[in-house]
Amino acid sequence: MKKLIIGLAVAVCSHSLFAACPSQSKTVFNCTTTNNKVIQVCDAGNTISYSFGKANATPELAITVPRNKVTTYQWEGFGRYENYAINIPNGKTIYRVNDSLDKMSQQYTAGVEVSNNDKLLATVECAANKKVTSKIQGIKLRPEM
């Protein structure tokens, strides 16, 4: 019985569960989607990490990219929509984590758009009734072209 309990503890602890960003990194973005999955971006200084998956489970996708490969879009101060985004590459696939405020209706939206070779594959939205943490505004990354 003791061996079974130890074996289960090792098995559970050996898999990285979805959690807050590691202590040496900062949360740039975090939300729960309409399908109860978590979108998370962490800034560790030299790297940016993106993860996606069910809360309290091993992420379905977790990538870490050198900071100089990640780009950002920052709102330029005019127009109806105040938009901010971070573009995280994984080969030819881009994960565009974004948030937007409609300045007329005050409707806030956030989520991730997944594209491959400039073709949009999926859009996943954060749940409107759940907390969104976004510190994309003002992040020091290369501007997107």
Predicted regions and their residues:
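Positively charged n-region of N-terminal signal peptides that target proteins for export
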Residues: M1-L4
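Sec-dependent N-terminal signal peptides
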Residues: I6-A9
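N-terminal signal peptide c-region/cleavage motif recognized by signal peptidases
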Residues: S14-S16
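Cysteine-centric segments in proteins
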Residues: A19-M145
